[in-house]
Amino acid sequence: MRCSAVSLGSGTIINAIATGFGSAFGVDLKIKADVELVDNCKKIINGISIDNPTLKPSLVERCVKNVLDHFEVDYSAKISTSGDIPIKSGLSSSSAASNAAVLATIGALGEKVDSDLVLDLAIKSSFEEKLTITGAYDDATASYFGGITVCNNMERKILKKDEFKEDIKVIVLMPEFQKNVDVNRMKLIKDYVEIAFEKCMEGDYYKALFLNGLLYSSALNFPSNISVDALEAGAITAGLSGTGPSYVALCYSEDKKNVENALKKYGNTVITKPSTNGARILY
């Protein structure tokens, strides 16, 4: 009983920590999970990251366990993950890994895939591993469905689905900044993030992303000039992704080199694009 599945990374439009309402968009970076089940009544689960063998596999192991518990089976399992989403970069690597792990395990069992169940078990696993503050329903849904999702994270409801109407590129900056998750400081900007969220609900995703990035980078002591540098180089919008340290900049194809050159002085960059091709079983 084997199955492989993939799920997307995502970039932030609105970080939900301040208000409980958030938005994210799928990007063409993925994590793949390969699951093999053994019917031996032992329920021994072993995981490994192919790209980073020293990375603790506790999240994906928890995902497999929660799926097996849900379907009341006591199989053992091996799970391996691989992909091109940097860990702890603000690009929803945890959401992508948990979605892919849950989906691959359900596929290996031969059970019918139900999107709500996949998301619930993936988020449950992330909570249990203390990898999320809000449940990251916006990140999880953008990773799973692709495109843009606008969500009430507290109630796990998608308020709106959309996609970028233009053919744009995504420049991801991954600077060597110390990650800072100060929830109290993020709560202080709640009233101002609500203004950015209103822009998001109106469909003005570029302004929402930029405003959100300025607010959260200020709260978390990341440089806000990076986003302005990206605009100066031709980006449509730019901002902090998640709680950082990554930034995302959106631009037209003809501007991607200028934008990348403006950003790469701060750290490594990756050029990708928005994706509407969400999570799926490969085989």
Curated annotation (Swiss-Prot):
Cell location: Cytoplasm
Pfam families given in the database record: GHMP_kinases_C, GHMP_kinases_N
Key words of the record: Amino-acid biosynthesis, Aromatic amino acid biosynthesis, ATP-binding, Cytoplasm, Kinase, Nucleotide-binding, Transferase
Domain of life where this protein originates: Archaea
Pathway: Metabolic intermediate biosynthesis; chorismate biosynthesis; chorismate from D-erythrose 4-phosphate and phosphoenolpyruvate: step 5/7
Reactions this protein catalyses: shikimate + ATP = 3-phosphoshikimate + ADP + H(+)
EC number: 2.7.1.71
Record bears the keyword Iron: no
Binding residue positions for ATP: 86-96
Keyword Nucleotide-binding (UniProt): yes
GO biological process: amino acid biosynthetic process; aromatic amino acid family biosynthetic process; chorismate biosynthetic process
Molecular function (Gene Ontology), one example: shikimate kinase activity
InterPro entries named among the record's database cross-references: GHMP_kinase_C_dom, GHMP_kinase_C_sf, GHMP_kinase_N_dom, Ribosomal_Su5_D2-typ_SF, Ribsml_uS5_D2-typ_fold_subgr, SK_arc
Name of the protein in its database record: Shikimate kinase
Organism this protein belongs to: Methanococcus maripaludis (strain C5 / ATCC BAA-1333)
Gene name as annotated: aroK
